[in-house]
A protein has these predicted regions:
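Carbohydrate-binding surfaces in secreted/extracellular proteins
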Residues: 610, 685, 736-768
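Flexible glycan-contacting loops in extracellular carbohydrate-active proteins
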Residues: 763-794
Length: 807
């Protein structure tokens, strides 16, 4: 079309055309075991292998193990060297979790869950004898992802997992489709559709060549049944599932086009993607739901050809990420001057919205984006983490997050966070104003790091961890936080780093906790906090909300919020509007259930002599890192590694080498996450110092801020513990250490130390005080070298045990 002669494809009045990219499956028969089967000829002929099935208008579940929840990795193929490429292409599984005898094993897919993303990789082979699965693709370049947080995963497309109503399996060699019917379904009335197409509408322009598709309107149409692609090597980790560049409605090089009253449903990839070279387009009153990946995507991961000036308005986008959990409800990549307004975005397994696609302070590629008047809720579902109701990246002048209602943002417990509004790496120059945020796992507002954003006139309520979190100290103003109300059930209003008041502005805020404990301002009283120059015109007072527990934050007429200049926030113009049937549409859909809580991890025990690999008995490789530890060497892995230079027993030990010029004074270091919450914990190890070794050992809990229990440090050839004179250490000889401490309700706030020096009787120091009286739980046990010069120390025979057999 052209400006003078636009083209419209529209439904006739009173009609609703439906375009399907699938084909009905017919010829069903019931097997003796109650499974229904049908033959899919295109599969038997080797022409296609669909990855979705919809039965009677509902998404059926590909047979998986387990049906709910996850399996856990047993370990890495090479646990001593995380950089070993084999660790990206496989892992050790717990005996019985997988089986090499499973049918069509190379069609099985392993879906690994990380913090903010997932991978979906095909199986290459399963070695039962070694309990190792080899994958047909790599998890990706990030070494953290090979076993993130214990390595959650599930197995999909496995015939042996066909054991729950609503599950299905497609046998590739025979073309036989197996389906376990849901209660109430009839084989004579089944309406089963398998998608064959990946894209249902494609606008194919070429902006760089000046070939633009323009002035086309689609109105009153429904598009359903699109499949998702599976490369031969699978889908490695990529944030926002951004590498899956396809959608049911997919556009490149498109301008001045409109999607109006369009429904996209039952599809496998993203719903709608206006990608490279798409500008001045509009989506209005569209319904996008039941997608395998994201809902609506604008722009791309590259900045050219430019995509800009697109509008998504009054749209209902929900129940997305059904297959690819790390995708987003509405995603704006390297794209500017877009508007997302009056939308309802709900039921995602990850973030509701994401804006920007550059990490750090590079020149902006996503600016002047407006996110306003949206209702964003029930995201995360405890499936992933490091997420937000609204999530941003990079320098973003002119970008506004304004007048949004955000609530029920829940992450997978145990690591990272879910925040209502999350300004991630480099987020700069944003305005965050007039938002209501409540019921989040972690924080109402979080800044990882960024510069000069304005946070004002917001309500942040009922976050489980903190109202406001600032994660990093930098030599500039992070943000101004003024005129906000922070409302909590607990006293922990602030989390993170707040020791540098010259680098942030906090004033004219109102704080309130419904609990009995006084509010803590990052471990300080309000008076101590104000003495730093913060919040001098702020109040601690009950704002007088009408019914905050049920989401009504209307202020009473005499609310003290008026004293800080707070402007009341109306929720009347948030979310969908129009005819009653459209506005009430969300009432027809149930919220997706949250993932079940993970099983409590078994308390970590360690028996590490640095001689052999526990799972196989193979020799521990020189240079290998300590098992089950997190190691930080600032990309110099040789600084912590197994060495044959010295040993307290056997032939090898662990060498920790400092070079004195790393970016962080506490590096190199490594730590374990024991998860000991009760009973008595014993740590024993041997160490050997050089004359100028400088290091410490600490036990910490997982609080924010954390509390320290037992601590010992070594410097100047001496060992220091609280309340005791320094103890001379022999240089170049091995010393034995034993620490015993009761935890949880049994804690006496003290610990015992036994020190075995060569040629001396064991020295016992009892009832040494914990560094913090609040310490009760061992979540972090670390060894840190803090020298400002080149030196080293050795460790051997690390033993960690607990009398508590379960957490």
């Amino acid at each position: 079309g052209t400006e003078d002669a636009p083209i419209t494809y529209a439904a006739m009045p009173g009609e609703r055309p439906v375009f399907s990219g699938g084909r009905r499956v017919v010829g069903w028969r019931e097997e003796p075991d109650g499974i229904w089967t049908a033959r899919v000829s295109a599969v038997a002929a080797g022409a296609r292998y669909p990855r979705q099935l919809f039965v009677n208008g509902r998404r059926a579940t590909r047979a998986r193990i387990p049906n709910v929840g996850y399996l856990q990795l047993a370990g890495l193929i090479n646990p001593y060297d995380r950089s070993d490429e084999r660790n990206r292409w496989g892992f050790r599984f717990r005996p019985g979790d997988l089986s090499g005898s499973w049918r069509n094993s190379t069609d099985i897919e392993i879906v690994k869950m990380f913090s903010w993303s997932t991978t979906r990789l095909p199986v290459s082979s399963i070695d039962d004898a070694a309990s190792v699965v080899h994958l047909g693709g790599s998890t990706g370049p990030d070494p953290r992802l090979i076993d993130w947080a214990g390595g959650r995963y599930y197995v999909e497309n496995v015939f042996e997992g066909l054991d729950r109503p609503g599950e299905w399996y497609l046998d590739r060699p025979t073309g036989t489709l197996y389906y376990m019917p849901r209660p109430g379904e009839s084989i004579d009335e089944i309406d089963a559709v398998m998608p064959l197409l990946e894209r249902l509408v494609e606008f194919r322009g070429h902006a760089a060549a000046g070939e633009i598709v323009g002035h086309i309107t689609l109105r009153g149409l429904t598009f359903e049944h699109a499949d998702w692609p599976m490369p031969a090597t699978g889908w490695p980790e990529r944030q926002a599932q951004s590498s899956m560049e396809t959608a049911a409605i997919y556009a490149r090089g498109v301008e001045h086009c409109t999607l109006e009253d369009i429904e996209v449903r039952h599809v496998g990839a993203h719903g709608v993607w206006l990608e490279r070279g798409c500008s001045y387009n509009r989506m209005e009153r569209c319904h996008v739901w039941d997608t395998g990946a994201g809902g609506v995507y604008l722009g791309a991961t590259t900045a050219t050809p430019e995509a800009s000036h697109n509008v998504v308005h009054n749209c209902y986008i929900h129940h997305c990420t059904e297959v690819h959990g790390g995708a987003i409800g509405v995603w704006i990549g390297r794209s500017s001057y877009n508007e997302i307004s009056r939308c309802e975005i709900a039921d995602m397994n990850y973030s509701g919205m994401s804006v920007g696609w550059s990490w750090g302070y590079a020149e902006s590629t996503a600016h002047h984006n407006i996110v306003a008047d949206n209702h964003i809720h029930h995201c995360g579902h405890r499936a992933l983490s490091d997420m937000g109701g609204i999530y941003t990246l990079g320098v973003a002048p002119g970008t506004e997050l304004r007048h949004n209602l955000i609530h029920d943002i829940w992450c997978y417990p145990g690591y990272s966070h879910a925040s209502g509004i999350y300004l991630d790496e480099g987020s700069t120059g944003l305005l965050v104003e007039d938002n209501i945020v409540y019921r989040c796992t972690s924080n109402g507002f979080l800044l990882h790091y960024g510069r000069e954003s304005t946070i004002r006139n917001n309500i942040l309520a009922f976050s489980e961890r903190n109202g406001v979190h600032r994660a990093r100290v930098e030599e500039h103003i992070s943000f101004s936080f003024e005129g906000n109300i922070v409302y909590s059930e607990h006293p922990f209003i602030l989390g993170g780093r707040w020791d540098d008041p010259e680098h942030y502005v906090m004033d004219r805020n109102l704080y309130w906790s419904t609990g009995e404990a006084p509010i803590s301002f990052a471990g300080r009283t309000f008076e101590e906090w104000q003495a730093m120059g913060n919040d001098r015109d702020s109040l601690i007072a009950n704002p007088g909300f009408r019914d905050p527990e049920h989401g009504d934050f209307t202020l009473a007429g005499d609310s003290p919020a008026a004293q800080i200049g707070f402007e009341p926030i109306s929720m009347a113009d948030i979310g969908l509007y129009g005819d009653p049937a459209w506005v009430s549409l969300p009432e027809r859909f149930e919220h997706q259930p949250d993932d079940p809580p993970p099983p409590a991890p078994e308390p970590l025990t360690i028996s590490e002599d640095f001689e052999t690999l526990p799972l196989t008995g193979e020799p521990a490789p020189l240079g290998g890192h300590p098992l089950r530890a997190v190691v930080n060497t600032e990309d110099r892995p040789e600084l912590v590694g197994i060495s044959d230079e010295q040993a307290a027993s056997g032939r090898q030990s662990l060498r920790v080498q400092d070079v004195g010029d790393l970016g962080r004074s506490y590096n190199p270091h490594f730590y374990y996450t024991p998860g000991h919450a009760a009973g008595t914990t014993r740590l024993a190890f041997d160490f050997r110092i050089e004359k100028d070794s400088v290091w410490f050992l600490e036990w910490r809990d997982g609080g924010h801020p954390y509390h320290i229990g037992p601590r010992l440090s070594v410097s100047d050839g001496k060992l220091t513990v609280p309340g005791q004179p320094p103890i001379e250490l022999p240089v170049g000889e091995w010393v034995g250490v034993e620490i015993i401490a009761a935890l949880g309700d049994d804690s006496a706030g003290a610990w015992d130390l036994a020190l075995s020096l060569p040629g001396q009787a064991t020295r016992k120091l009892q009832k040494l005080p914990n560094n913090h009286k609040e310490f009760r739980k061992l979540d972090w046990l670390g060894f840190c070298s803090t020298a400002d010069h080149a030196t080293a120390f050795h460790l051997d025979n690390i033993e960690l045990s607990t009398t508590r057999s379960e957490p």
